[in-house]
Curated annotation (Swiss-Prot):
Subunit structure: F-type ATPases have 2 components, F(1) - the catalytic core - and F(0) - the membrane proton channel. F(1) has five subunits: alpha(3), beta(3), gamma(1), delta(1), epsilon(1). F(0) has four main subunits: a(1), b(1), b'(1) and c(10-14). The alpha and beta chains form an alternating ring which encloses part of the gamma chain. F(1) is attached to F(0) by a central stalk formed by the gamma and epsilon chains, while a peripheral stalk is formed by the delta, b and b' chains.
Pfam families named among the record's database cross-references: ATP-synt_B
Thylakoid is among the record's keywords: yes
Species this protein is from: Synechococcus sp. (strain CC9902)
Chain's gene name: atpF2
Localisation per UniProt entry: Cellular thylakoid membrane
Bilayer topology annotation: Single-pass membrane protein
Listed NCBIfam families: PRK07353.1
Name recorded for this polypeptide: ATP synthase subunit b'
Length: 154
């Protein structure tokens, strides 16, 4: 019955704020909505954000490690390349020296062969010259004997 009397009484005209059950009801609604949003939205979104941040930090750490490894490998390969170039350069120098030595040796052999052939030719020519002189001397002696014989016979 008291409820009925209150319902019939109407709303009293108050001042700036009316102190009735609306304000605490709104406060309870705000608190319930906060808990509900926290449970249904903010926690899952926060978890996703934290997972994403963890993934990003892990990915960045892995990328830094891989970058450091790549830089080490690059330095090692550069050192190996430098060593290989030096080795190739020394092989080239050795080959050039060997070719130069072989060239000089072949040139010396060719000069020796040419000198030997020249000396043999000179000896052969000298022998032929001496042979020709001997033949000529023999013919000269024969001709001179023939001339003397003819002169004396005449």
């Amino acid at each position: 019955m008291t409820w009925l009397l209150l319902a019939e009484a109407g709303v009293p005209e108050g001042g700036l704020f009316d102190l009735d059950a609306t304000l605490p009801l709104m406060a309870v609604q705000v608190v319930l909505l906060t808990f509900l949003l926290n449970a249904l939205f903010f926690r899952p979104v926060g978890k996703v954000v934290e997972d994403r941040e963890g993934f990003i930090s892990t990915s960045r750490a892995d990328a830094k490690q891989k970058l450091a490894q790549v830089e080490r490998l690059e330095a090692d390969l550069a050192e190996q390349l430098k060593g290989a170039r030096q080795a190739v350069q020394s092989v080239i120098v050795d080959a050039e020296q060997e070719v130069d030595g072989l060239y000089r040796e072949a040139l010396a052999q060719a000069e020796a062969e040419a000198n030997r052939t020249k000396e043999e030719s000179r000896r052969g020519i000298e022998a032929e010259r001496e042979s020709a002189r001997a033949q000529l001397k023999g013919k000269v002696d024969q001709l001179s004997t023939t001339i003397i014989d003819r002169l004396l016979a005449a």
